[in-house]
Each structure stands twice: as C-alpha cells, then as structure tokens.
Design a protein with these regions (language model features):
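Short, solvent-exposed loop/turn motifs
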Residues: 58, 90, 108-109
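A short acidic-Thr-Gly-centered motif at the start of a beta-strand
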Residues: 84, 92-94
Length: 243
C-alpha cells in the first residue's frame, strides 16, 4: 500500500510504499564535480634551485609551488641541451654550475649566481592564463642570419631575445630591447613546439644582469624586476635563495 505525504504549498507529492520506503525515490546519483572545475584547480610544479652561497659553496633545493606566471618566468627560458658560452668554452645548460663565468653579449664575463629549473609535462592542464607555458619555441639554424643560431635552438616558454636594431632608437630611443621569443613565431623558421615527452627547462641569474650567448643568439638572463619581494608571499621567496 502506498501513501502520499502531505507537503507544503508549491511542493510536489512523493508517493511512498510502506513495505518499501525507498520505492519512488530518485535513483540518480549526486552530480560529480565537473571536469571543467577540475581543470580550473591551480597547477603546482616542482621547482629546483641551485645557488652560490656567500662562502662560495653550491646549494640546491626543490620546492613545490603554484605555477604562477612569476614563478614560471624564473624557471623556463632555456630547454635542456642549450649550449652557453663560458670562460671554459661551450657548456650545456644542464651542466652549468653556480660559480662558473659565462660570456655575455655585452662583452663581459659574468659569474652565475643562481640556476632554476622545472619540468614541463605534455598534456598538463594549466588554465587559460598559462596556456603558453607548455609550449616551446624552436628556432631553426640561421633563422636570423649566418650563425644566428648556429644550430637549431629550443627555448622555453619565457625566453626573451635581445633585439638590436637601428629602428629601435627611432621608436624608443633605446639601442636594444628584450622581446619574447614567441613574438617571432612564423611557422617556418621559428616554430611553436608542444613536447611529446617531459622536458626540463632552465633559467640563470648573473652577478650583473646581461644577455647570455646561446648558440649565436642573445638570450636575456633572468631578472625579477624591482620590488618583486612585495609581490609574492614571503614563504615563496625561498625559491630565490641566492637573491
């Protein structure tokens, strides 16, 4: 036998069987968290830092932190295999150590104070604000002229190239300017590449800011800018121990 509960005005009656109280109840499961909501969750990465202490010792640390643009920029300019010019000759970025001196495009030898690295995983969800953070930029040999670069060069998402052009003076009054490598994408000699396997990318801080000589191109060394300590949580500043 079934009865109908008396409900308030505007509510639909729900028939209930006394012998089977569950009869008539909806079998629908509660809604699951939408996939879109899952993708909206902030991405975190493992960031590795390697720096030179005031005593001249090399220390390293690995921290988990949000994949914010500020952090991504500090760790993602040069892909593994990029070769830099140093006082000791060409050195791959993965073999470079704090304390070594690199040759800058400005004609100086500058000591490396800090090296940061992270791994880009293919297919990682980064959200709309970080969509560009999983793609690399491949610059084919001599895309910018003889020996520039000497060989194909793969740069990280946040690499910036030093552009020296007489026209800059007319526009900005500057002799040179740093431009994102992605700005040169043309689909022919400068190509966007999505890695099919995990790729380690790096960035470098010099004792005095300058341009790294990488395969014949000038790539900006990392500089966080003025007042960065006021922009991020003090707990996150430990990622930049050397500074």
């Amino acid at each position: 036998m079934s009865i109908t509960h008396r409900l308030g005005a505007g509510q639909a009656a729900l028939p209930v069987d006394r012998d089977d109280p569950s009869a008539g109840l909806s079998a629908r499961k509660p809604p699951l968290l939408a996939a879109k909501s899952l993708r909206a969750m902030p991405l975190t990465r493992r960031y590795q830092s390697c720096w030179l202490t005031p005593e001249g010792a090399v220390q390293t640390s690995t921290r988990l932190a949000p994949a914010t643009p500020l952090f991504e920029e500090a760790f993602s300019a040069l892909a593994r295999g990029s070769v830099l010019m140093t006082e000791d000759g060409p050195v791959a970025i993965e073999d470079l150590q704090p304390g070594q001196s690199v040759l800058t495009a400005e004609g100086r030898a500058e000591r490396v104070c800090w090296i940061g690295s992270m791994v880009i995983y293919p297919g990682a969800e980064t959200g709309r604000d970080l969509e560009e953070q999983v793609s690399l930029t491949r610059i084919t040999a001599e895309a910018f002229g003889a020996g520039r670069p000497a060989l194909d060069l793969v740069l990280g998402p946040r690499a910036r190239l030093c552009l020296r052009d007489p026209r800059l003076r007319r526009v900005s009054g500057l002799e040179a300017a740093y431009v994102p490598a992605r700005a040169f994408l043309d689909g022919i000699s400068v190509i966007e590449v999505t890695p099919s396997a995990p790729v380690t990318v790096y960035h470098v801080v010099l004792e005095q800011h300058g341009s790294l000589r990488v395969a014949g191109l000038e790539v900006e060394a990392f500089h966080p800018g003025e007042g960065v300590e006021r922009m991020i949580d003090p707990r996150m500043l430990s990622l930049f121990e050397a500074q």
